[in-house]
Swiss-Prot record:
Keywords assigned by UniProt, alphabetized: Cell membrane, Membrane, Protein transport, Translocation, Transmembrane, Transmembrane helix, Transport
Segments crossing the lipid bilayer: 32-51
GO cellular component term of the entry, any: plasma membrane
Topological domain ranges for the Cytoplasmic compartment: 1-31
Membrane topology (Extracellular): 52-55
Species classification: Archaea, Methanobacteriati, Thermoplasmatota, Thermoplasmata, Thermoplasmatales
Name used for this protein in its record: Preprotein translocase subunit SecG
Gene name of the record: secG
Principal place of residence: membrane
Location in or out of the cell: Cell membrane
Membrane topology: Single-pass membrane protein
Role summary: Involved in protein export. The function of the beta subunit is unknown, but it may be involved in stabilization of the trimeric complex.
Lineage: superkingdom: Archaea
Biological processes annotated in GO: protein transport
Length: 55
């Protein structure tokens, strides 16, 4: 019967499960909020530079 047959599915057939199991985190781990705050700070500095920097 079909219900007794165990299928591996598309992911294991394509090797995707093995790929995601071997994934390593490289580089510094940053909090997502910190990345947003840094982006906002850089945007503010750019806008202030446009205002105060002599053309």
């Amino acid at each position: 019967m079909a219900s007794d047959k165990k299928s591996e599915g598309f992911q294991s057939g394509a090797g995707l499960i093995r790929y995601f199991e071997e994934e390593e985190i490289k580089g510094p781990a940053l909090d997502p909020k910190l990345v947003v705050y840094i982006g906002i700070a850089v945007a503010i500095m750019v806008e202030l530079a446009k205002i105060f920097w002599p053309p």
